[in-house]
Amino acid sequence: MESLLLARLPEAYVVFSPIVDVLPIIPVFFLLLAFVWQAAIGFR
């Protein structure tokens, strides 16, 4: 039962692989956005 579920999960997530590839970049993007925003306000 578990082996069937584990075998079927990767095939189900093939559709979401581009989204999963982008997900680790999103926190870095928000961190850079917050840093630029604080720098712009600080240098005003």
Curated annotation (Swiss-Prot):
InterPro entries: PSII_PsbK (IPR003687), PSII_PsbK_sf (IPR037270)
Transmembrane segments: 23-43
Subcellular location(s) per record: Plastid, Chloroplast thylakoid membrane
Keyword field contains Thylakoid: yes
Keywords: Chloroplast, Membrane, Photosynthesis, Photosystem II, Plastid, Reaction center, Thylakoid, Transmembrane, Transmembrane helix
Topology of this chain in the membrane: Single-pass membrane protein
GO CC field: chloroplast thylakoid membrane; photosystem II reaction center
Main subcellular location of this protein, as a coarse class: plastid
Highest taxon of the lineage: Eukaryota
Propeptide part(s) removed at maturation, as residue ranges: 1-7
GO biological process: photosynthesis
Similarity section: Belongs to the PsbK family.
Subunit text: PSII is composed of 1 copy each of membrane proteins PsbA, PsbB, PsbC, PsbD, PsbE, PsbF, PsbH, PsbI, PsbJ, PsbK, PsbL, PsbM, PsbT, PsbX, PsbY, PsbZ, Psb30/Ycf12, at least 3 peripheral proteins of the oxygen-evolving complex and a large number of cofactors. It forms dimeric complexes.
Task performed by this protein: One of the components of the core complex of photosystem II (PSII). PSII is a light-driven water:plastoquinone oxidoreductase that uses light energy to abstract electrons from H(2)O, generating O(2) and a proton gradient subsequently used for ATP formation. It consists of a core antenna complex that captures photons, and an electron transfer chain that converts photonic excitation into a charge separation.
Protein name, UniProt field: Photosystem II reaction center protein K
